[in-house]
Amino acid sequence: MKAIKLITAAMAVCFLALPVWAEVKIKEVTSPGGITAWLVEDHSIPFTALELRFRGGTSLDKPGKRGATYLMAGLLEEGAGPLPAQDYARALESLAAGFSYDADKDTVSISAQFLSENRNRAIDLLRQTIHEPRFDQDALDRVRAQVLAGLRSDAKDPNDIAGRVFSQMAFGDHPYGTEGNGTIESVTALTRQDMFDAHEAVFARDRLYVGAVGDITEAELGALLDTLLADLPAEGAPIPGPADVTIEGGVTVVDYDTPQSVALFGHIGIKRDDPRYFAAYLLNQILGGGSFDSRLMSEVREKRGLTYGVYSYLVPRDLGAVYMGSVASANGKIAETVEVIQTEWAKLAAEGVTEKELADAKTYLTGAYPLRFDGNSRIASILAGMQMDDLPIDYVATRNDKVNAVTLDEINKVAAEILLPDQLHFIVVGRPEGLQSTN
């Protein structure tokens, strides 16, 4: 999605990380109007990053209106209040501020960055964006054309094709079963009124999470929150219920004329609030978490040369979790690639990990964690995400302790519980040799 990112050279320095991640002191702030936010004060530079998250995301689309929330979020930068698109862009640029908007299946996000000297004017402009979007027809037609161009491109991308097929097989008629940016047919049919309806569904206080980092005090943030958000409705549209993961083991081949097949694979996963999550997180790092030491990378790439990269990853969405992976291989090698992945999945479930693998995974994951705190905007995003995941406010300080507390017995027990080789389904897009759909 396009987003306004008018960050000047003067503002670039404002993305420097806080000095020491372990010293990040998070405060919970409640505004006079009752809006809660998490704050990290940093007065070393005259700059603040603000992250707003609204739970529900594109899953709030009404039946027959798929893509409405995604398109609505893309239009937020196209004018607000008395300002049409060009005047809005000029106003934002004059403030040396940056606003960006995004929508995924669980969340609509607004990220804002502004200098302290321009804070009040930037917040006034952002307030108009949230409360008074214009959704002018010319802007709607322009952004719709961009979304449609993206959808046409996605229709030719093997990775996107695989993703859409997997989502439909895994989640069926649930909103997770279709992509949030919609289809060519659904997006073409969306109207200006649909944008106002989507806006009303999303922007409410009962699904709001706020993170702030930078040159702002608790009192100043409280006043800002009320100015910006106090007039939002108390409640938005109902959030859909949990999604049943219905995908079963097997192979689905999608014919596509390309010399290399793309495979997306997975089965039911584990939610973020599951007490086994940290063991699962370490387990995934060992199986296919991205390093060259992972079992999948070792067996599929290093030993057999079947691919340049193979990965597995946990996808703990709000309403339903899957455990997934991806790989690409030549049409003549993809059948062997699938077989090796199936074998390693089953082997790890049956035999577990070694003491050394667990120790190495702990070292990697605890060492990499501080690198996430690489700028005020990133930290503000983390603060909002922590709240959405219902994590405690001291999570930053205790997270690595939780990783290190996982025992060998615990991780191997979890491996047997969450790795389900018989339920592993492969979506293969290409013209694979020696591989056919099983259902």
Predicted features and spans:
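Short, solvent-exposed loop/turn elements at domain surfaces
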Residues: W38-L39, P46-A49, S59-K62, D273-D274, ...
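Short N-terminal segments immediately surrounding and downstream of signal-peptide cleavage
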Residues: E23-D42
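Charge-rich, well-structured scaffold segments of protease-associated domains
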Residues: K2, D87-G236, V253, K303-R304, ...
